[in-house]
Amino acid sequence: MNILFIFSRHSENPNDSTLTKDLSDEFFKQGNNVTVVTLLEKKYKRETELKKENGYEVLRVKTGNYFNIGNKFEKGMTILTMASDLKKEIIKYLGDRKFDLIITHTPFVSTEKLINPLKEYFKCPAYLILWDIFPQNAKDIGIINNGLLFSFFKYREKKMLSAYDRILCMSEGNINYLKENYSYLDKNKIKLLRNWAIIKPNTEINKQEIRNKYGFSEDEFIAIFGGNMGKPQKLENILFLAERSLENKKIKFLFIGNGSEKERLEKLVKENNLSNITFINQVPREDYEKITASCDVGLVSLDERFTVPNFPSKTTDYFKLSLPILASLDRCAAEDYGNFLQNKVRGGLFAEAGDIEGLYNQFMKLYNDESLRKTLGNNGRKYYEEYLGVDKAYETIMNEIGRWKWVFLQVKLY
């Protein structure tokens, strides 16, 4: 099959592993003709280019700047012009190709202003991987307070979702939320596609050497949060947990990554003398996994104000590395993700976000019981191996393509 992927990012390093890159690599590995379209921000001072990377063609389209910039006006202008930039260059460079399917993801590159013209031009269906439910998630945590602005984005959301032939959700909670709150959607279009990863064997690491490199001793108990430090995570709740744990000198907290809230969090740590917290900037993937594997607990955090189900993607990394998870979750996520984590996989524990004493009690269960940590970590690893391989994601999508073709054929016949 000829597959057109449209991704907001696509690493040029063939050894990098990300959700989107792993998926396109798998489609290519399975014998499909793969083309990836992705952004090439103007800050890199390069023009639009089409070249082979890792065996298949990648079209990098010059756009405005979006990632890791503080200028909201510039970011907004990039979003407004992105669809037309991408559409123009896709037609210019790929217009003579035949595609059987378009696959993209939220946010930003999924707008119907891009997808509808491409569907019509290439005469093929489009599948959406739904990673966030915007604008409701932004309203929940106070990013959008204006009623008119919220209504505008809800209108845009309806136009976007209606453009797709399949909407692929990360969890049963996402599926149920869409079915209950989006009456205009055909329920048969909404399907489950769990996050995925390349299945790799457990690798032995020198735990003491890695810990020493980053200033930790072998006998310390390290809880790690890796990933985006933004408003949705509300990492103040983890700071409160760290403050509650200050008396125990063996307990340490490690934050790895970047994000819009990182600077503010570092300031809070300094102001409150939270000497048990360490921040590390984003590191290469291989180093991140080694650091994470040398820790004792993986942390997940979500703002308690959320009313939409979220499924933290870092879960797959923790499962992969046999790391037990402690999650601070809003009520909506507790019913979906929390139940999945604690009762289905049995790969971790959770408490409701904002209940610091409840979170601390769950944390101390893990601290005091090495056997429990090992059991939870092994359960997560087992689930990862059985259900979260990128090959499973590939099979899910291919099965949906088969069903879509069958329905399309029936419509033509009758």
Where in this protein do the model-derived segments appear?
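A short, well-ordered alpha-helix in the C-terminal region of glycosyltransferases
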Residues: 358, 365, 372-386
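N-terminal subdomain of nucleotide-sugar transferases
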Residues: 1-57, 245, 409-414
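A short helix/loop element that forms part of the nucleotide-sugar donor recognition site in Leloir-type
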Residues: 48-51, 202-216
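Helix-loop-beta element that forms the nucleotide-linked donor phosphate-binding surface
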Residues: 162, 168-169, 174-197
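Conserved donor-binding/catalytic core segment of Leloir-type glycosyltransferases
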Residues: 217-233, 238-242, 254
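Nucleotide-activated donor-binding/catalytic signature segment of Leloir-type glycosyltransferases, i.e.
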Residues: 248-250, 254-257, 262-289
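Nucleotide-sugar-dependent
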Residues: 14, 233, 284-293, 298-319, ...
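Membrane-proximal helix-turn-helix segments that form the acceptor-binding/catalytic region
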Residues: 117-121, 148-169
